[in-house]
Amino acid sequence: MHLYHSICYNYEYKYIFIFIIITNTRGVTMPRSINTVGGGSQTNSNGLKFEQSTLLDDALREKGCIVKDCYVYLDGNIPIGMSVCKRNLYSKFFEKYNIDYRQFNSKRWEPDDCYISFKNETAYIIEKKFQNSSGSVDEKLAACHFKLLEYIKLFSAIGYKTVYIFVLNDWFKRPEYRDILDYIRFMGCFYFFNEIPLNFLGL
């Protein structure tokens, strides 16, 4: 088995991408998953549970957090982060830093939900994909890496890291989604079924 890797450094935005490829003894090239955390973790009692219509605010409140004007509080008067969905990401968060998204992205991307942790200075982009039949959502899953790069350009401007997460329903446990789920992990993104573990978000 042979290991090859390449490193791409973007000097404008100062982030690094590492691509790893493993070839087995039969000469077949196989991707190695860089992500070791996501990838379909089992649901548990210490997670934020989602359904198709569930808002992050409601999921946080179910776990004892207080969400007020997009700020998230837990056991104190000092906010631990922000919950900003859709346009609120820009009007409630980026405007505080006088950041115009057009300086970084040609289009304004509006996530289903986003949790921004002040503790570890990380933005968790959350996209919910729930379906009961094959359809256009399949292709949207494959766009995860592009969307991750777009958000990285935005958040790196203020020194924040970016994590891109899919919350999927059980439909995506079907065998035909194995390759796309592997691809999501390989591209440095994450997915969970129905629930995001609290510790994954630093809560």
Briefly describe each language-model feature range:
Residues 1-77, 88-89:
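Nuclease-adjacent, charged terminal/linker segments that flank catalytic cores
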Residues 24-30, 149, 171-203:
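Non-catalytic C-terminal interaction segments of nucleic acid-processing enzymes
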Residues 66, 158-161, 190:
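Short coil/loop linkers at secondary-structure junctions
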Residues 66-120:
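Active-site metal-binding core of divalent-cation-utilizing nuclease and nuclease-like domains
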Residues 121-123, 130-184:
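Catalytic cores of nucleic-acid endonucleases
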Residues 125, 167, 192-194:
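A structural signal for short, well-ordered beta-strand segments and their strand-loop junctions
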